[in-house]
A protein has these predicted regions:
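Catalytic alpha-helical scaffold of carbohydrate-active enzymes acting on polysaccharides/glycoconjugates
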Residues: 1-132, 137-185, 211-233, 241-290
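Surface-exposed cleft-lining segments at the edges of enzyme active sites
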Residues: 130, 196-209, 236-238
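Glycine-rich, positively charged active-site loop/lid region within alpha/beta enzyme cores that binds
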Residues: 181-203
Length: 290
């Protein structure tokens, strides 16, 4: 599989781009209004920015690892001081909708409205203009790539099509987005988010053992490292940022840090590097109907 291995900066062997979705209490229950009748759901989500985020930022500082946080603008608006700490401590902010809207259900005009609203809030609240996007809900519509390009986005971390970054071309012939695919195998919801009181997600399995989760995640990294690829996570502070789970993350980061030749990078650094290495592939595609 050597032909699949990208060239990483400074002859590094593999890449790790830690990414967290700071959803807070946004999502379906907020969008349909039911969250306001279920305080337990709200507090389950608000734990992320209110309590877990600071713990995760301290952990990242201990291991000297940068990260990217995809933040719904409503969360930045509601917890500005907590979200400002992300920027102050040297990490990246990416777009993640306003209230975690399902982009795949929205017309392009509505997607543009959400991107513009999010850009204004994040600039005013945090002083940043993100260049990255992770789609809320895990999918998007055929028009989304062009919507993102119009909004000044340079990369996405939304799709699942490779173990390396790749290029996404839109319909309008503009330069492509870099896609930095996250890995469902390292989505903490799959292992750590099933619980009761409230029963969410309803009817699903109980929480996995922490030792088994650490073993799974370690094997995922080891496979990426062996083949010289890129590991991008789908972690959620409200899920993984609790005291017992921080120990799990610390053990995982310690294992990754102990390996030689791992480039730990913010997602925008990965995207910029990938575009520089694949400039020929990044040229606009001519439209045959023009």
């Amino acid at each position: 599989m050597a032909e699949l291995a990208p060239r990483w900066p400074d002859a590094q062997h593999a890449c790790v781009a830690l990414a967290f979705d700071l959803d807070g209490p946004t999502g379906d229950a907020m969008l349909n209004g039911s969250i306001w009748r279920k305080p337990a759901y709200f507090t389950l989500g608000s734990y992320g920015p209110w309590r877990a985020l600071g713990r995760l930022l301290d952990m990242l500082a201990t291991f000297d690892v940068p990260a990217t946080f995809f933040v719904p603008a409503w969360v930045a608006q509601t917890w500005p001081a907590q979200c400002a700490a992300i920027v102050e401590r040297g990490h990246e902010i990416g777009y993640h909708g306003y209230r975690h809207e399902a982009f795949w259900t929205l017309e392009p005009a509505r997607q543009r409205e959400i991107m513009a609203q999010s850009a204004e809030i994040l600039a005013r609240t945090l002083g940043v203009r993100p260049v990255g996007f992770r789609t809320p809900s895990g999918d998007w519509s055929a028009a989304t790539v062009d919507v993102l390009r119009e909004a000044g986005v340079r990369y996405s971390s939304s799709m699942r099509g490779d173990d390396r970054p790749y290029l996404l071309h839109g319909e309008n012939g503009e330069p492509p987005l870099v896609e930095i695919p996250g890995r469902w195998e390292t989505d903490d919801y799959a292992s750590l988010a099933y619980h009761r009181n409230p029963d969410y997600p309803a009817g699903l399995d109980r929480i996995a053992g922490y030792a088994a989760t650490l073993d799974n995640w370690t094997r995922e990294f080891d496979g990426v490292y062996r083949e010289g690829l890129c590991l991008t996570t789908l972690l959620h502070p409200k899920v993984c940022g609790k005291p017992g789970r921080i120990a799990l993350l610390e053990a995982w980061l310690g294992h990754m840090r102990a390996q030689d030749g791992v480039w730990f990078a913010r997602c925008h650094q990965v995207a910029d590097w990938w575009l520089a290495q694949h400039a020929r592939d990044a040229q606009p595609i001519p439209r045959s109907d023009r």
